[in-house]
Amino acid sequence: HMVTSIDGKVIGEFLNRPECEAATEIYYEMNREYKAQGSGGFICGRVTMEGSFTGGWYPDLSEYKPVARECGHYMNCWFDDVADAKYFAIAFDPKGKLGWKSNIIEDSDPGYGGAMIIEVLTEQVDPRYLAYLEEKEISYFFAGETEIDVPLALKILRDHLSPEFYV
């Protein structure tokens, strides 16, 4: 679900207008209800995650050594360790541009707060970004060469989290 302006925009000043207040509250109520009913999490693109959670901060990758993809084509070695988590924030971040401070979303809204982060990347990501994610213990996997292959990403999530996984 999503709140949009009449012209299809998903971000902008319209979200702060009094006329939109009821719609945005319904949006957040639905999100909290989905979480309470056992939704596996939520998926957002890089721009939304940046605007809502990372604030545009980006790590200095010069401090990191490139990580080789040793665990196969699609996921890092410890991806399966997240399967016990109850709720996920799945970031479609093709080029690896999000600057997370930890591996958990810290947000006052219970519909988002406490979600474990999983990064969905493409193979064009800087291998130093993988080292950054591993330092933060953020799980990631690859779903596409230059663009995210959404059906593949959803299949990987279901295969590694739960066959009943839904967002």
Question: What are the language-model segments listed below?
Answer:
Residues 2-6, 12-156:
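Active-site ligand-binding patch in enzyme domains
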Residues 157-167:
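A contiguous pocket-lining binding segment that forms or flanks enzyme active sites
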